[in-house]
Amino acid sequence: MAKEKPHVNIVFIGHVDHGKSTTIGRLLFDTANIPENIIKKFEEMGEKGKSFKFAWVMDRLKEERERGITIDVAHTKFETPHRYITIIDAPGHRDFVKNMITGASQADAAVLVVAATDGVMPQTKEHAFLARTLGINHIIVAINKMDMVNYDQKVFEKVKAQVEKLLKMLGYKDFPVIPISAWEGDNVVKKSDKMPWYKGPTLIEALDQIPEPPKPIDKPLRIPIQDVYSIKGVGTVPVGRVETGVLRVGDVVIFEPASTIFHKPIQGEVKSIEMHHEPLQEAYPGDNIGFNVRGVGKNDIKRGDVAGHTTNPPTVVRPKDTFKAQIIVLNHPTAITVGYTPVLHAHTTQVAVRFEQLLAKLDPRTGNIVEENPQFIKTGDSAIVILRPTKAMVIEPVKEIPQMGRFAIRDMGQTVAAGMVISIQKAE
């Protein structure tokens, strides 16, 4: 049997109006992956005589977006010769940051779209910092709107230099920079004849070369629980995605912070595992599974609990403990000071956390400390802080289990900051 093509999740990032949606639209249009409902609408309008025009499709997508129906560009799939690619999200969705962190899908790579007409803009920087903070290691740069600068190589080189400077400061190496026109279809799927000076890959060729994401099977087992069902004749069935490690029938698993909160181990032997209604003997990272655990009741566990092996249980941070984190403030109306208590979202959990200390303000580009013990931090700042959860929760240092160490901080219906756990300080 031929090995299945690797699945890769990508996000599109970049400044507003630089052409992210158009680029996604063009990728889907030229690979014949436009959502069914749009094609249907086209046919219903009796426009069979006209060629299926890109501009028309983009207008429909835009209309539906404005009516508040996101054509879920999110979770749109297409194939390249060597990859199955899922576009998991694009900013502009209000919950973009939260989705990137707590979403069922961690991005393997990002496409940074920069308009040749503008170059690097504030959001270009913010999204690039964010990609770094969220552990996206592979980036592809698309310099869009080349048609608006007459496909001029000099303009391309100038913008390319700006982007390279930004990304290299953030520690990115070896990334393709591709001149495209999403609107005209140059170098997205089809090679352009308008830029003979460019010898590199098209966008789809670059996507086809994204490294296969490694499966973290050597890390300790962690399964954040999304839901808990009670199934007649089976019993309690927690459902979640295996983030790290391997779960096998017969393993003994423990749930945290449930065990800490109930002051008794909520644990048992795994009797069965199912994925898409098929029984499995073992489940690997990325698998969305339901599993039945002997002796664990429906009221013992809930969304936000995490399953791990009893030999290496999930790390619990209690209200008497604290953790040190590096954050980037994305959107706060005034300033964050000690005592601020927003809600932290990580994997499937959400818990209010208190800012206990502001240890240092960092230069977001270099990571160097620019100020010790600042009085406050504001939008655009990167900082090292000490946080204390208001109730027990599972979170892991990002160096040990990166999948379980990233978080979003939300308040007033928006994402205020994104961050990662550096270390955990347990109270005696």
Curated annotation (Swiss-Prot):
Q: Which InterPro entries match?
A: EFTu-like_2 (IPR004161), G_TR_CS (IPR031157), GTP-eEF1A_C (IPR054696), P-loop_NTPase (IPR027417), Small_GTP-bd (IPR005225), T_Tr_GTP-bd_dom (IPR000795), TRAFAC_GTPase_members (IPR050100), Transl_B-barrel_sf (IPR009000)
Instruction: State the signal peptide span.
Output: none
Task: Cite a single GO MF annotation.
Answer: GTP binding
Q: Using the UniProt annotation, give all residue ranges assigned to the region (G1).
A: 14-21
Positions bound to Mg(2+): 21
Give the span(s) annotated as G4.
144-147
Assigned keywords, A-Z = Cytoplasm, Elongation factor, GTP-binding, Hydrolase, Magnesium, Metal-binding, Nucleotide-binding, Protein biosynthesis
Q: Where is this region: G3?
A: 89-92
Give the tr-type G domain ranges. Answer: 5-215
Reaction(s) catalysed by this chain, per the record, are: GTP + H2O = GDP + phosphate + H(+)
A GO cellular component entry from the record = cytoplasm
Q: Where is this region: G5?
A: 181-183
Record localization:
Cytoplasm
The positions annotated for binding GTP are: 14-21, 89-93, 144-147
Please give the Pfam families that the UniProt record associates with this protein: GTP-eEF1A_C, GTP_EFTU, GTP_EFTU_D2
CDD domains for this protein: EF1_alpha, EF1_alpha_II, EF1_alpha_III
Q: Where is the region G2? A: 68-72
What does the record give as EC number? 3.6.5.3
Function, in words:
GTP hydrolase that promotes the GTP-dependent binding of aminoacyl-tRNA to the A-site of ribosomes during protein biosynthesis.
The entry assigns this protein to a family as follows: Belongs to the TRAFAC class translation factor GTPase superfamily. Classic translation factor GTPase family. EF-Tu/EF-1A subfamily.
PANTHER family linked to this entry: TRANSLATION FACTOR
Q: What protein name applies here?
A: Elongation factor 1-alpha
Originating organism: Thermococcus gammatolerans (strain DSM 15229 / JCM 11827 / EJ3)
